Amino acid sequence: MVLRLEGSWSLLVGKRFLSLSGDDDGPWDTERVAEWPWQAGRIRAVSHTDISKPDLKICVEFDDESWEKRRWIEVYSPKMKVFLVEQKLVLAERRSHGGSISPVQWPAMTYKSLVDKAGLGPMVSIRYLGEEKCVFLSKDLLTPIQDVESSRLPLKDDQTVNEEIQALVKKHLDETRLVQGGKNIIGSKIRIYSLDPSTQWFTAVVVNGNPATRTLEVNCQEIPALKTLDPELIHVEIIYDNNGKCDKSKRIGGVKRKPSENSGSVDAKHTKSSPEVSQSQGHVHSVPTVFGEALLGCTPANKDQRHQGLPLPANSPPNLGAETPQGTCRRSVPEVHPSCLNAGTKPLKENLTLFPKVTYITKEQTQNINDQNGKYTSLISSRSSSLSDSTNGKETGLKNISEPLLKPTTNFPKECISAKPLQHLNSSIAIPRVNSSVELQRTLDCRPSTSDAHLLPFTEAGVRSHSGSNSQKGNKVDEHVEMEFFTRRNSNEAFYERNENESFWTGSTKIQDNVIVRKSILADASKVKKLQQSGEAFVQDGSCNNIAPHLHKCRECRLDSYRKNKDQKDSTVFCRFFHFRRLQFNKHGILREEGFLTPNKYDPEAISLWLPLSKNVVGLDLDTAKYILANIGDHFCQLVISEKEVMSTIEPHRQVAWKRAVRGVREMCDVCDTTIFNLRWVCSKCGFGVCVDCYRMRKKGIHEDDDSDTFSWFKCVKGQEHEPENLMPTQIIPGRALYDVGDIVHSVRTKWGIKANCPCANKQFKALSKPTLKEDSKQNLVPGERTSLQQSNLVLSPQLPTHEPPVKPAAGSKQTASVTTSPSLSWLSNITSGNVNKENKEKLLVPISKNENKALQTLPSLAKPAAALQTFNSAILTPVSNNNTGFLRNLLNSSGGKTDNGLKSTPKILDDIFASLVQNRTVTDMPKKPQGLTIKPTIMGFDTPHYWLCDNRLLCLQDPNNESNWNVFRECWKQGQPVMVSGVHHKLNADLWRPESFRKEFGQQEVDLVNCRTNEIITGATVGDFWDGFEDISSRLRTEEGEPMVLKLKDWPPGEDFRDMMPSRFDDLMKNIPLPEYTRRGGKLNLASRLPNYFVRPDLGPKMYNAYGLITPEDRKYGTTNLHLDVSDAANVMVYVGIPKGQADQEEEVLKTIQDGDSDELTIKRFTESREKPGALWHIYAAKDTEKIREFLKKVAEEQGQENPVDHDPIHDQSWYLDRSLRKRLHQEYGVQGWAIVQFLGDVVFIPAGAPHQVHNLYSCIKVAEDFVSPEHVKHCFWLTQEFRYLSHTHTNHEDKLQVKNVIYHAVKDAVGILRANESSLSRS
């Protein structure tokens, strides 16, 4: 991270100041400013967070007085002549004492003027780092510091200055975390400034933080009544130990976190913004100034916990500086630090001192309003009163949501059980976005991986909070914190889940002290003795370093040699063999390896995650279940077949291992970063794991440039190469659950009349019978392990055995390994076949017309096979031929005469209309060129106002809240066409989306800006800089030539922070976003909602896109967002359009741009006649045309002398904007025509997954996009995931975050669960 310090610092408390006061009204001689009677000191408390309020009071300590004589002063009183507060670091000219050497640029702290009645004018007070006194210079002699590292270059030999810079950076980071809800300091010790005359400081421990109210919840033994405080009103500092580590209390339950010094990523560089508050919370916060036992800023707060951490590959060099986002867990975790970060990140020194030495000198008798009660509880800020109702309401809601979670999913040994009732703490968490190139370590799931006899008994209880040395009798509180880790092993991200309807937030993590891990069986001497005597095998229940340091260590445990101190080592959280590898004592009492768990060693808890429930599924109804199964049932079958094919290639003598899924861990391929669904190959020595595709490619010897692999493989122990034949086949899904569900799918589709078009009936695939589990004779089942699953809420086919003794395949079964992929096997099995290499990679992407015999020919077609459904009948499921893509529109826009049978008077849904029309109208009855007219509801018998744009190729729905929208939408959507919905701005709260509201709330945040004309990234700017020029060209940042720049905000809000930064805007958007069945997180047709909470849910937004307009004729060749495509579907909402002042003839230029963009007449009339506000010009292309566009761009690149690297892609690189000339060539040379769409204020553009698109802002726009996964486009989602494997690791899309296979599996699992639960209705009907 490069931390820029030229922006204003956010707090007054803790800052040094200079003041000049008295009755003398001057005049003051500025030539002798250094001789004025200045008073210096430090601010300890403030009465308001708004420094502009005229009644602002501050509690200060003066340098020439003792702290006991602190006082409250009025900043804007008549006697105050000048009041300066330290603000930012700059470079200032400094001459040597002799004056013979030319001046040098020296880092200095500037002071900002709050009051200046003496007329300082251009004079600025600064303090050179390394000195104590302040001097005054002209503003012209100051230069901004671009970053901390650049300021250190000329000062490498000055240790004092370097240390002070580091201390300032660390202080600034701590202030940011404190103000933003304690994001990285949960469990940290802090010291709080005391307004009690008897003491200056007292200590407390951070329990939780509330991002919405920006307050901290603390546990203070000195003042038990103190619960919450506001760090913006009272001086708070984090306490560090002698090693520069954040001191963590061992008394508070839950996960303890340490603040980080850097974030390791440009994306993560942004400071966490101040969260949005409601109108009731928006007044100026003030508190009375009270002494005695009084504390400023006491406010109610929600609980908040976070987690941190994780290391790089085993053969990567360590880098010990790291960002520390956080998470939550039900238990305390031993402290572990990541061993590495981005190579470009320079860590701060470990021995930094947070608090520069301050001399506290005397001051006058303080003026105060005595607290009548003399209690800390008597002082409540106005912020507290304004937030109490809303906060309590939120806490109540969270409590209700999380009450079902009180029963822990993790079983703990009796040694860890608390004797007292557990206190449940609600959690509300936000984690900053971080770079995705760093390998994360896994977090701990303490539930057992097997039910072997040696395992300790478990109970369903919480974890006792451990009391440290500071604990006092009578003050012990057992706290049970509902928390979970969500960490991806090989990507720098961690996830926390609020509840099943909420998304996850990401961030890199460091696991800190006090996560309580179940006591290892080896810690019990009596049990160890018994195991030694019996020779019984048991599962490794700790890290390699703790359990078996002399045996092979996994990749994470081997990284301990890079870690600096013992506290960082031996964490079970990181171990890849935890609850996976089996161990055994030999006859000499020496511990040795005894293989790994096998698929038949599952328990009901493990299998329940993968089998459908026998009761109705929340958020899913019968009709929707049928529709989902009709759309993705075949894809699921192909998924099962591909797994069977891989299993059939495994030699009979090879044992398949089972690695159970770990809660919150997204298992990734160590080579290509693709999410592993089930099968993979694992190294038994170090835990290295690769996906099916990477294994097959390596095994077949596919190389790139004849000297390197397409994907690099990390080396094993002692630098040994990982050879494919030495890797161990491993599955995640226990037992035969995958194949059992496949059988259930066929049974259910037959019973419900859902016609299947899967290749399961193909003779070639009949040979791929259900694989049998290979039994390890040494893994004996324990009593109780053979429990019948019929007692659980699982759906199993009656004929499917539950735990019959597995049978090893016969030697002749190897013949199935030679079965080649049939052309009838569609997209899924072919994509994962072994024919993917650098030579033929592009052949897989060839258009259908050029690759007739490829199984991928089904890719462009989004229509699903016919199915005899009751509600979703054959008409809606029948594929539409290519030459009749406008069939429905032709019918709907025709005269509407009755058919022979006549139309139903009140059809239930649109499908009935389609069925009736399709059965009774011929194509010859339809006009050849339908007119783009609005359909009258009375004609069709349903109320779905809409019209057609783009020459009748684009559906535009007019009522965003119409309940019939999704039926009309679905017909176009399933054919891969974009759709638009208008009028959403009438539903939204307009005040929330105005630029001034963003400027007011987040103006001081530091961000990166992008120059849309040059793609240059501008650093060191603030959010306020962007919004100042949003509607005022004269206020925009300018180039060196003095031209105003056309800018867009880069990744703001940063990462997945939208909900936490802007909760009211999030609620406003989710409440009014059209087609909620698809777009809401819990929408019944949003397949991402079917992924269980056990998994890491993908980040689907919302995300904001804020940019100026490109108005001039020269700007028409530039794009606000260049041509690209997304792995998921998206709904992009235009929430605000700003027409900037300061430029003439804007309307004329915008009209020319719209016309130049190939817009149709109806679109132009919306601008010229209806006077709607146009925001952005879109060009969207069908997903099936992607390869043609790719070939065209490569051709143009070659014409321009550009290279086309193998691991880059002209579309995924987002390096092209198709102007009119390129669009014309694309149409003429490749026959590709897209949709030219002008998005007006309130329009929502729906972009199908895999559809290339580009955006050109006409005016300044604020857009918000929400992603989703629809049943109609799952095929494209998977295809894109395969494409992204070939991108370089620098691409944001390289990593597979959508987990398409998991989404398909669990969506089908839930659908068949609903259908099985309603089979009784079939007999009645």
From Swiss-Prot:
GO terms for biological process: regulation of transcription by RNA polymerase II. Coiled coil: none annotated. PROSITE patterns: JMJC. It is found in: Cytoplasm; Nucleus. Residues 1062-1285 form the JmjC domain. The keyword Transcription regulation applies. A motif (LXXLL motif) lies at residues 888-892. SMART domains: JmjC. It catalyses: N(6),N(6)-dimethyl-L-lysyl(9)-[histone H3] + 2 2-oxoglutarate + 2 O2 = L-lysyl(9)-[histone H3] + 2 formaldehyde + 2 succinate + 2 CO2. Binds 1 Fe(2+) ion per subunit. GO terms for molecular function: chromatin DNA binding; histone H3K9 demethylase activity; histone H3K9me/H3K9me2 demethylase activity; transcription coregulator activity; zinc ion binding. Keywords: Chromatin regulator, Cytoplasm, Dioxygenase, Iron, Metal-binding, Nucleus, Oxidoreductase, Transcription, Transcription regulation, Zinc, Zinc-finger. Residues 274-283 have a biased composition (Polar residues). Its main location: cytoplasm. Gene3D superfamilies: Cupin. Histone demethylase that specifically demethylates 'Lys-9' of histone H3, thereby playing a central role in histone code. Preferentially demethylates mono- and dimethylated H3 'Lys-9' residue, with a preference for dimethylated residue, while it has weak or no activity on trimethylated H3 'Lys-9'. Demethylation of Lys residue generates formaldehyde and succinate. Belongs to the JHDM2 histone demethylase family. The JmjC domain and the C6-type zinc-finger are required for the demethylation activity. This is Lysine-specific demethylase 3A. The lineage of its organism: Eukaryota, Metazoa, Chordata, Craniata, Vertebrata.
